[in-house]
Amino acid sequence: MGTSAVILEICLLLSQVLTTVSSTTQTESTTEDRTQITETAFWETQTINSVSESDLPGTHASSFHTEEPLTTIAAEGTEWDLALRLVNGGDRCQGRVEILYQGSWGTVCDDSWDTNDANVVCRQLGCGWAVSAPGSARFGQGLGPILLDDLRCSGHETYLWSCPHSGWKTHNCGHQEDAGVICSGAQRSSTVIPDWWYTTTRSQTAHIRSTIPAWWHPTTTTAARTEWDLALRLVNGGDRCQGRVEVLYQGSWGTVCDDSWDTNDANVVCRQLGCGWAVSAPGSARFGQGSGPILLDDLRCSGHETYLWSCPHSGWNTHNCGHHEDAGVICSDAQRSSTVIPDWWYTTTPSQTAHIRSTIPAWWHPTTTTAARTEWDLALRLVNGGDRCQGRVEVLYQGSWGTVCDDSWDTNDANVVCRQLGCGWAVSAPGSARFGQGSGPILLDDLRCSGHETYLWSCPHSGWNTHNCGHHEDAGVICSDAQRSSTVIPDWWYTTTPSQTWWHPTTTTAASPSSPCGGFLTSASGTFSSPSYPGLYPNNANCVWEIEVNSGYRINLGFNNLQLEVHINCIYDYIEIFDESPGSNTSLGKICNHTSQIFTSSYNRMTVRFRSDGSVQKPGFSAWYNSFPRDASLRLVNSNSSYPSCAGRVEIYQGGRWGTVCDDGWDIQDAQVVCRQLGCGNAVSAPGNAYFGPGSGPITLDDVACSGTESTLWQCRNRGWFSHNCGHSEDAGVICSVPAFTTTPPATNYSCGGFLSQAAGGFNSPFYPGNYPNNANCVWDIEVQNNYRVTVVFRDVQLESGCNFDYIEVFDGPYRSSPLLARVCNGASGSFTSSSNFMSIRFISDVSVTRAGFRANYYSSPSSGSTRLHCLQNHMQASVSTSYLQSLGYSARDLVIPGWEWSYQCQPQITSTQVTFTIPYSSCGTIQRVDNDTITYSNSLRAAVSSGIIKRKKDLNMYVSCRMLQNTWVNTVYIANDTLEVQNVQYGNFDVNISFFTSSSFLYPVRSSPYYVDLNQNLYLQAELLHANASLALFVDTCVASPYPNDFTTLTYDLIRSGCVKDETYQSYSQPSPRIVRFKFSSFHFLSRFPSVYLQCKMVVCRAFDSSSRCRRGCVVRSKRDVGSYQEKVDVVLGPIQLQTLHAEKRSLDQPAVDLEEKASAQGSYDGAAISAGIFLVVVLAVAAFTLGRRGRAADGQPLISKT
């Protein structure tokens, strides 16, 4: 019995062992299957659509499957085929560095590998900072190609491949030198599966552990439902907020049929993905045909559902469609870039990664929204508000969620929150714990946002964890995209949101508005209006419209009607327009009365703010906007013998092609703008129906509606660029006038020459087609935007016969220092093109015979893209195309600043398309030369063949030079012996900041525009040269007054000319520094028929301590015709100045503007309004003056003006 019992126990033990082994094997198989499915889903979301599923790395049985796939993470770069990961290290933040390049994963060599390089990897992967940068294949040897070697990161790059390196696949390494990284976010045990992984399995509870980095959730474009296998994404649309709609269902991504698909359905998608609202709901496979199952059909959303699959539909996998009917969405937050970004990019940001789809727990999205900053431990959300776009503001900081105090909390702060979370704009900024009291730390207090910041924590505040608040003061936000489920609409709602009700001006009964209060406008053109327009707008309105159009375009803004409560300084109800340029926003104007002015942005963004106070109400305003390309030019072509000049078919240049204008709505006012823009006088006729023949290019504009006062054709209202319903049989034309013909030169004063800075235009000899004067010496300087070239065309040349008497000279740059391209004489014609962005035309006549003269037009076109040079205030930026270098046999790494190869400051930024050097004027070997009031900064770039006995390719030398106040050669290439030399010289600008001040103390700048003043009031001006070079000085050469903003020759009054004071009230003040000048004069106006006065001041830039410079010579008397070149002057136009009038109907706060100094003291301080002006750049700043009588200045030849 004892032996039997022992045998029985042994058998039972063997049975248990076998059972355990079997169970373990089955579990491992299940785990492997699950891992394979997860990897497949990962790769499916990380590859561009053109790659078939069979080609996806995650679907192959490759060696990567044995290298702990659970702990591998990838971060993508800007190129579609670049990604980064750490493998074989035990968790996602340590391991061997691998890069996905051209479809294959490869390693990085450890030559020069250090913690600077490792820091870039850790930051890119959202893994904190580098703890260690081990080499020698510390995490095992890789199997793919060795992609990068000799990396020399500074530690601040966004992507590892942005660091200087020896070139892709250029190395001298083996896999035994594979580089690795250990980041601060690495797990400290490789045997434990990290907590965040548990949310990816079906059997585990979906809890977010503290180990999930802050950036994980807000950057994904998938939105999960309560079922583990449901998620949403947009693919193949170029960015994360537009594309084909795809749903993850039962482990596979599928499409949605476009039957009944409309903006209500699309709105649900955009809201669910945090992409704003629906701009469009395209069907018919607009973003390409999908390849998976068609999951949903006949969707009938109301637009308020939380998830797309919550809408009524025909059932999962029930449809009668094909993939040619796949539905798409374009959301308001979609990028406006034409660059195609692969599908996998949509789930991440450039500096972080989030490869998660179904792993996000369902409860995360419906009630909270997070938005991550670049720091791994910062995020933002709204909680306890009923949906993702309203609630208590909470910030994730150092691993814990905390609240924000409501001290100084307002809609500017709330706007930043709403924009950061993709929730539209701020409807309200409630405090006092409106959404309940939080329980975590109070992280921020005294926030003072401008409303334009990208992140809430970028706003000025009192410091992290620094406050004097309790949780009863927790701040909240209600955004425009918040659900309208609340049963009680608060009173403040009616004046601040595009809701269903609105305050009526005389009763508490709400009236329906005709337009919302603020919003984001992303169309190429559009309209908007004040709340309830044309009804009365509400009191205490604060509306902000943010307009953003395609990159490379600018914005025009005009007003159809404007009726606000009027005040001379617009302090009650007003509209303010801001020019949103990179890194700053500048006020273009503050208005409260109707104006025909067109406001134009410098870049592709503009902000319009409307504010009303607590009393008087008016109908408000109706505004329109459109956009136009920055490189637009204008010309007339195909004129006939009846109209030899200033007539023809209207054509516009944009994007490398000339296109026509449709004649729909084309009239004399439109033609007037064309004639003025080209310097062709007034419009005589505006023929349509292809009067000058049909064009062959694109039809660029249609439905043009000019008022006749615009400065360019594209400032006029139109249908949008390349949007039309026309054919070339409807091409528009113009016939312009010319001044009256005279046979003898007039005995009156004349002006010739000047500075032309438009992209295209025209000019002519004095009195053309009347006879030009004797002894003329006229110089026209033409400067267009950087890296463009100028082409001038002479259409009619009637000069004295023989080139030794009267002639025209064309210079490739400023005429005193540049090569002569041609001398044009009687009867000649043709066109000439500069090698840079600057050209000078000089016209000379002798003492005898005169004739009709000439007229010419010019236009600009882009120069070669192989090399570019930009001259900025404190450094130059030289860019060279990598394809150009490759064509010469060099790689991007071969190009250096000789002698400065190892200085970090002097190393280039290398991308796949160009090599860019940022070269300071004060270092990296830059040479400064001062000559004749001109400062030239020069340096060189070199790519040389390695030393050896023989060589088979030329050395490359590139000379770069910025001549401040002089000219440029760009992309002039010539061969010299065995060296290929490229000389780049760029014409640069000095910037001058000029402002009006309220008194001689120069403490308070004047902000209002126009600037209303009393007759004979002292006007104080300060101009400052903005440049880092302390050896420069500024001098006021000439200031001329005119009643016209663009004409300073017909009727003028001199304040100071050539340094000689002409007006007895002009007075200069001592200079606080050589770069600042101050002066004053008394206000006046030109007779009673001219209500405004404009000033044109010419500022001269000199060497500060040069006794022979122009700044030291003071008053200089010189001949009128000795115009020389304007290259040392900065021209600034100021105006209009208008007489201050009192408004009797205004409240008792109005007082006569007797002493602006006292007003300044009472108000504390004024905001500054300064306008920067480059060389020859005409900048309009509002100022003002008026008249009641007149006074003659006949002795000086000055026009009649009034000062008493």
Curated annotation (Swiss-Prot):
Disulfide pattern: 109-173, 122-183, 153-163, 257-321, 270-331, 301-311, 405-469, 418-479, 449-459, 517-543, 570-592, 662-726, 675-736, 706-716, 752-778, 803-825, 1039-1097
Keywords assigned by UniProt, alphabetized: Cytoplasmic vesicle, Developmental protein, Differentiation, Disulfide bond, Glycoprotein, Membrane, Protein transport, Repeat, Secreted, Signal, Transmembrane, Transmembrane helix, Transport
Topology term for the membrane: Single-pass membrane protein
Leader peptide range in chain numbering: 1-19
Transmembrane segments: 1168-1188
Gene Ontology cellular component list: extracellular matrix; extracellular region; plasma membrane; transport vesicle membrane; zymogen granule membrane
Modification after translation (UniProt): Highly N- and O-glycosylated. The O-glycans are heavily sulfated.
Subcellular location: Secreted; Cytoplasmic vesicle, Secretory vesicle membrane
InterPro entries, A to Z: CUB_dom, Sperma_CUB_dom_sf, SRCR, SRCR-like_dom_sf, ZP-C, ZP-C_dom, ZP-N, ZP_dom
Domain ZP, first and last residues per copy: 870-1118
Residues carrying covalently attached carbohydrate according to the record: 585, 593, 640, 749, 932, 977, 993, 1029
Family assignment from sequence similarity: Belongs to the DMBT1 family.
Domain notes: The SRCR domains mediate binding to bacteria.
Name of the protein in question: Scavenger receptor cysteine-rich domain-containing protein DMBT1
